[in-house]
Every structure is written in structure tokens, then in C-alpha cells.
């Protein structure tokens, strides 16, 4: 089973999906059409959906959907229909799943052509030598085609190639990570917006002005040992503020005059 209780850990990757909708009274044809549309991008080939009754009389649905390309989703709610959430599984044996769905349906709907699972090369070593032995490439291709999760992929490799597993495990782990990449967890800000908003630019400016850009009399007295009282410190700071303001105004005035003179010089043409 590839479903999970958490969207962050969920990964469904298969061409044969087995769905069970518990407590779902909808008709199989309606559900089948909705599922067919959901997997449209992966080219659906076949779907079968059957309605069965619980012992308490409530209805539930079983469905098998086959696609040309592997359905791949990290959303555990991808197959939800009108609030009905299914159990999602990879159908390792479509033949057995289809037989299970057909066991005692109250209503049934099919669309497309059923695709039996291709014959696997795994586990055929006990057969006689009259049959051609599959190559490593064929076995590996079979594993890649049928594995539905990283643990299952590595387990199949270990069973088929025990020596290679022991000597080249890092390569198989690398390919497993590429075939079944980990789902990135969604970032959650550990410092959500508060009241008042600490990211408010105006609030930051109001704090910077008195705490960073201004020198308090007490801090000035620490830097000037000859200043003994708060009043003297305030007087000195006021004088420094006036002096600084005057110097800034003088610099701006000189810069403005220089700019005007430069502009006048540019207007004069060469002497005749």
C-alpha cells in the first residue's frame, strides 16, 4: 500500500491502481467516469468498478484503474470524489484484483480493455533449462516496471542480484532515490505573523529612531568622562545636533551652487 496518513509522506506511483471507497452509495458508472477523468493525463486504458454491500447494509465500491503511463501523485486526496476518500493501493496483480472485484457485485461498470500483468522474470529460476534464461537487463527492466516504492524496489533487487547487492549497494540506492524521490516537507514558518506585526516597516522605524539613531544623555556621559551631569550631556548633544545640521545645510548649499555654475559653463560656447 502506498497511501499514508500524511500528505508529506504520501507517494503513489503505479499503472495499476486499486481503490476502495467505504460507505459510498454512488453508482459505479458515476465513480468510474470521475476516476477516468482524474487520470486522463496518464492515458487511461481500462477501469472496472463494482458496488458491494456491507453486513450492515451500507454500500461500498471497489475499482481498478489501468493507465498507459504510471500514475504519479503526492496528494493523498487525489482520488477523493464528492467527499468520499478511498483506500489507495498499487495492484501488484491486476488479474487477482479484478477477480476480487467480480466476486459478488450488486452493480458493475467496465470501460476499456483489461490489460493482464505481463509475465515476470522474477522467480523463474526453478524452471527447466529448455526455456531461455532472461538477461540481467531484462530482469532489471522487470523490477523497474513493477516496483511501486523504494523498499520494494531494493527488496526485488536484493532477491534477484544478491552478489551485486552486496558489492554495489550504493548504486542501487542511488537509482532507488531517483525512481522514488523523497517528498519535500512543506516549510512552516516558526515565527508566524503576530499582533502588532513585527514586520511592519513603520513600527521598525519608530523603534530605530530613539534606540539606534539617537544618543541618550546617559550613553554620552559614558563616552565623555568630563561630562558630569545629565544637563551638561543634554546641552552638549543639542550643540552637536545644531552643528551637524548646519554643516549638512552648508554642504547641500555648496553642492547646489557648484551644480548651477557647472551648468552655466556648459552653456558657453568656444570663443570665436
From Swiss-Prot:
Cofactor, how bound (note): Divalent metal cations, possibly Mg(2+) or Mn(2+).
Primary residence: host cell
Protein source organism: Maize streak virus genotype D (isolate Raw)
Region of interest: Oligomerization: 175-187
Positions of the UniProt region annotated as Disordered: 250-272
Keywords associated with the record: Activator, Covalent protein-DNA linkage, DNA replication, DNA-binding, Endonuclease, G1/S host cell cycle checkpoint dysregulation by virus, Host cytoplasm, Host nucleus, Host-virus interaction, Hydrolase, Metal-binding, Modulation of host cell cycle by virus, Nuclease, Nucleotide-binding, Nucleotidyltransferase, Repressor, Transferase
Subunit structure: Homooligomer. Interacts with host retinoblastoma-related protein 1 (RBR1), and may thereby deregulate the host cell cycle. Part of the C- and V-complexes which are RepA-Rep-DNA complexes involved in the c-sense and v-sense transcription.
Region (Binding to RBR1): 198-202
Compartmental location: Host nucleus; Host cytoplasm
Domain remark from Swiss-Prot or TrEMBL: There are 3 rolling circle replication (RCR) motifs. RCR-2 may be involved in metal coordination. RCR-3 is required for phosphodiester bond cleavage for initiation of RCR.
Motif (RCR-1): 18-21
Protein name: Replication-associated protein A
Source organism, top-level taxon: Viruses
Biased composition range(s): Polar residues: 250-265
Amino acid at each position: 500500500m502506498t497511501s499514508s496518513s500524511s500528505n508529506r509522506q504520501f507517494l503513489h506511483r503505479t499503472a495499476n491502481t486499486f481503490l476502495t471507497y467505504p460507505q459510498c452509495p454512488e453508482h459505479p458508472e458515476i465513480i468510474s467516469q470521475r476516476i477516468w477523468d482524474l487520470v486522463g493525463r496518464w492515458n487511461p486504458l481500462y477501469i472496472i468498478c463494482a458496488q458491494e454491500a456491507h453486513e450492515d447494509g451500507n454500500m461500498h465500491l471497489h475499482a481498478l484503474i489501468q493507465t498507459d503511463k504510471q500514475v504519479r501523485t503526492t496528494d493523498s486526496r487525489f482520488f477523493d470524489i464528492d467527499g468520499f476518500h478511498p483506500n489507495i493501493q498499487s495492484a501488484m496483480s491486476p488479474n487477482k484484483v479484478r477477480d476480487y472485484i467480480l466476486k459478488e457485485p450488486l452493480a458493475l461498470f467496465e470501460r476499456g480493455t483489461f490489460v493482464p500483468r505481463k509475465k515476470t522474470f522474477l522467480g523463474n529460476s526453478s524452471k527447466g533449462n529448455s526455456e531461455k534464461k532472461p538477461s540481467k537487463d531484462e530482469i532489471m527492466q522487470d523490477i523497474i516496471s513493477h516496483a511501486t516504492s523504494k523498499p520494494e524496489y531494493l527488496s526485488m533487487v536484493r532477491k534477484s542480484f544478491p552478489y551485486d547487492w552486496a558489492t554495489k549497494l550504493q548504486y542501487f540506492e542511488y537509482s532507488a532515490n531517483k525512481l522514488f524521490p523523497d517528498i519535500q516537507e512543506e516549510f512552516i514558518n516558526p515565527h508566524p505573523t503576530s499582533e502588532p506585526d513585527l514586520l511592519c516597516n513603520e513600527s521598525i522605524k519608530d523603534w530605530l529612531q530613539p534606540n539606534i539613531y539617537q544618543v541618550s544623555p546617559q550613553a554620552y556621559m559614558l563616552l565623555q568622562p568630563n561630562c558630569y551631569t545629565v544637563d551638561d550631556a543634554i546641552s552638549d548633544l543639542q550643540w552637536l545636533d545644531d552643528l551637524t545640521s548646519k554643516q549638512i545645510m552648508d554642504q547641500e548649499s555648496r553642492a547646489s551652487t557648484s551644480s548651477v555654475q557647472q551648468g552655466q559653463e556648459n552653456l558657453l560656447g568656444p570663443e570665436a
